[in-house]
């Protein structure tokens, strides 16, 4: 079989939207090469789990590589893929010095290329995300989340995912009920289950994402706790009195449903919102306040922000 590699050079803020577009067009795997991963200083208490090579990363910005089976249909779609990516600017997503290149690769290159960018990632001193193909021996009481990131949704390496998992670790109590909005790979639902949640509803509008989530949930043996539903945000979700709602999605999307979050939460319930670039944090913060939520804490990693808010006790 012949494969094509689509290489997109863009900004950190555009990573998830670009990866999602490529996946929706049928990419069989996506890798993300971000120089920030190389330059990021890691705290010694988490330890260095893997060695990064500087030559694997771009000088600036992010390179996203997606792999497509080279068919006549794919070749015809190439201009449409490029234009769809360029159209992301209409949603105020900066693409930077956008570059779009298509190369041919052989079977062996495809099978290994995207995997070399995924390694075990220690999120907290208790939680580590491990690619499903890697052997990893956990320490005592360490929580392991196994992921197959081949569908490009939320591998755990992105700062917003890490911010959400750390917040879940801080706020989730055993027996809590959780809603995970925009679940992607299911990583936040799986983390919630392994932290002791009693029940989790994981929603995503994208059918490919819900399938990826179901596969990862089964891989982690948490399907008895997590229900996956293809759904647009919290529309027609009648659950109330929920302990935690978590959403790792773009700021523009978070702005669409803070009132629905308020209705879903029990008094004192927590909303963990990330996917927020730093310069849009104030707008999201104000929207949450206007919906009646109280800002509890704001955390930041690099250019990304997580806002933790709660419904007041009535």
Swiss-Prot record:
S-adenosyl-L-methionine binds at residues 161, 182, 204, 248. GO terms for molecular function: protein-lysine N-methyltransferase activity. The keyword Translocase does not apply. SUPFAM superfamilies: S-adenosyl-L-methionine-dependent methyltransferases (SSF53335). Keywords: Cytoplasm, Methyltransferase, S-adenosyl-L-methionine, Transferase. One of its GO terms (cellular component) is cytoplasm. Its EC number is 2.1.1.-. It catalyses: L-lysyl-[protein] + 3 S-adenosyl-L-methionine = N(6),N(6),N(6)-trimethyl-L-lysyl-[protein] + 3 S-adenosyl-L-homocysteine + 3 H(+). GO terms for biological process: methylation. It comes from the Bacteria. It is found in: Cytoplasm. NCBIfam families: prmA. Belongs to the methyltransferase superfamily. PrmA family. This is Ribosomal protein L11 methyltransferase. The gene is prmA.
């Amino acid at each position: 079989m012949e494969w094509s590699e689509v290489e997109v050079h863009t900004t950190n803020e555009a990573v998830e939207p670009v990866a999602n577009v490529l996946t929706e067009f049928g990419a069989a795997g996506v890798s993300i090469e971000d120089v920030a991963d190389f330059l990021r200083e890691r705290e010694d208490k988490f330890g260095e789990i893997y060695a990064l090579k500087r030559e694997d990363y771009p000088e600036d910005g992010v390179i996203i590589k997606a792999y497509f089976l080279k068919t006549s249909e794919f070749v015809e779609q190439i201009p449409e893929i490029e234009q769809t990516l360029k159209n992301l600017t209409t949603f105020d997503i900066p693409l930077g010095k956008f570059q779009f290149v298509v190369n041919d690769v052989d079977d062996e290159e495809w099978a290994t290329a995207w995997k070399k960018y995924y390694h075990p990632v220690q999120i907290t001193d208790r939680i580590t995300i491990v690619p499903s193909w890697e052997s990893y021996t956990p320490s005592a009481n360490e929580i392991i989340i196994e992921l197959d990131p081949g569908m490009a949704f939320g591998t755990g390496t992105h700062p917003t995912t890490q911010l959400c998992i750390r917040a879940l670790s801080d706020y989730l109590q055993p027996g809590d009920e959780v809603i995970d909005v925009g679940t992607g790979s299911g990583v936040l639902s799986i983390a919630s289950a392994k932290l002791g949640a009693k029940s989790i509803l994981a929603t995503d509008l994208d059918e490919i994402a819900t399938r990826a989530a179901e596969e990862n949930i089964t891989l982690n043996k948490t399907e008895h706790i997590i229900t996956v539903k293809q759904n647009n945000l919290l529309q027609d979700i009648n659950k109330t009195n929920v302990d935690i709602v978590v959403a790792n999605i773009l700021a523009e999307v978070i702005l669409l449903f803070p009132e629905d979050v308020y209705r879903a939460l029990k008094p004192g319930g927590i909303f963990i919102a990330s996917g927020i670039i730093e310069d849009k944090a104030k707008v999201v913060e104000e929207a949450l306040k206007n919906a009646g939520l109280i800002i509890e804490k704001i955390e930041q990693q690099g250019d990304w922000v997580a806002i933790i808010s709660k419904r007041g006790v009535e």
